[in-house]
């Protein structure tokens, strides 16, 4: 029974594809030129990568570290000292 149900659901899922219009219909509002979109994305990504590498190697973006003295004491006192734990 499970095989019949799966086959029926697959048939129902595939029916809209049989009635679909031609995927090459360039006048359709759902037509996308995927090759041009992919090429444009690759070019844009490559330019961003090159710009990032150039910015990192230029040395203009340096981390400015201000050495402020720490507000913590020089030596911290331990929270647990030997002999302070209770034995149950």
UniProtKB/Swiss-Prot annotation:
Subcellular location as annotated: Cell membrane; Basolateral cell membrane
Regions of this protein lying in the Extracellular compartment: 21-38
- Domain of life here? Eukaryota
* PROSITE patterns from the UniProt entry: FXYD
Q: Which residues cross the membrane?
A: 39-59
Q: Listed GO cellular component terms?
A: basolateral plasma membrane; sodium:potassium-exchanging ATPase complex
List the Cytoplasmic topological domains.
60-88
Signal sequence span per UniProt? 1-20
Indicate the family of this protein: Belongs to the FXYD family.
Quaternary state and interactors: Regulatory subunit of the sodium/potassium-transporting ATPase which is composed of a catalytic alpha subunit, a non-catalytic beta subunit and a regulatory subunit. The regulatory subunit, a member of the FXYD protein family, modulates the enzymatic activity in a tissue- and isoform-specific way by changing affinities of the Na+/K+-ATPase toward Na(+), K(+) or ATP.
This one is known as: FXYD domain-containing ion transport regulator 4
């Amino acid at each position: 029974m499970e095989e019949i149900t799966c086959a029926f659901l697959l048939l129902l899922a595939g029916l809209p594809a049989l009635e679909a219009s031609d995927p090459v219909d360039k006048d359709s509002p759902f037509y996308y030129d995927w090759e041009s979109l992919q090429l444009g994305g690759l070019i844009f990504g490559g330019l961003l990568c090159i710009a990032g590498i150039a910015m990192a190697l230029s040395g203009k973006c340096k981390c400015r570290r201000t050495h402020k003295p720490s507000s913590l004491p020089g030596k911290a006192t331990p929270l647990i000292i030997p002999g302070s734990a209770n034995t149950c």
